[in-house]
Amino acid sequence: MRLSFILAVTCTGLLACATASDSEKAAKISNDQVLSGRQLIDTVAKDNKKRLLRAYKDAEDDSEDSKNVKPTADSKHADESEDSEDSQEERFSLIQTSNQPRYYWWFQHHMTPLDVRRDLELTADTINPIKRSVYTGYVDYYEDHCSYYENRKEEFCKAEDF
C-alpha cells in the first residue's frame, strides 16, 4: 500500500513538473495571478499552501530602484539563507502529506496538540525533526479544523495550552 502511494505521489509530481515547465514556456506568471489562485486550491495544512503557491523570484518589478541596485555580499547571503530555508521546508512535505490520515484520526478522537505531543513522546529536549514536523503539521491541522463552524463549540477545540 505504501509502495503504491509513493508511486502515485511520484507520478503526480512528475506530471505537475511537466505541466509547470510547459506553462512557464507558454506564459509568464505574475505575482497577482499566483495569489489569486489561492482560493482554488484547498489543502489541509498551511505549510502545504505556502509551498504550492510560491511566487516566482524572476517576476517583473516595475520600480527602477530595484533594477539599479547591485547585489552585495549581504544580499547574496540573504538569498542563500532563503534557499536553504525553502529546501528545509520542502524536505518534510512528503512526511506531512503521508501523515494526513493520522491527523484526521487524532482529530476525530478529540486529541489536542498537547495530547499529540504526549502521544509522540515529544519533549522540549527532543531533537527528532520528523516528530517535530508531524507535531507542527497537526497543530496547523487542528487550528484549521477548529475554526470550522461545526467544530468551534467542541470542548477539545477550546484548549489553548499546547
From Swiss-Prot:
Highest taxon of source: Eukaryota
Keyword Magnesium: no
Stated role: Effector that enhances P.infestans colonization of Nicotiana benthamiana leaves.
Motif (RxLR-dEER): 51-91
Region Disordered, annotated ranges: 55-93
Comment, domains: The RxLR-dEER motif acts to carry the protein into the host cell cytoplasm through binding to cell surface phosphatidylinositol-3-phosphate.
Keywords carried by this UniProt record: Host cytoplasm, Host nucleus, Secreted, Signal, Virulence
Family, per entry: Belongs to the RxLR effector family.
Provenance organism: Phytophthora infestans (strain T30-4) (Potato late blight agent)
A GO CC annotation given for this chain: host cell nucleus
Secretion signal span: 1-20
The protein's name in its UniProt record: RxLR effector protein PexRD50
Basic and acidic residues bias locations: 65-79
Subcellular locations according to the entry: Secreted; Host cytoplasm; Host nucleus
Coiled-coil parts of chain: none
Inducing or repressing factors: Expression is induced during host plant infection.
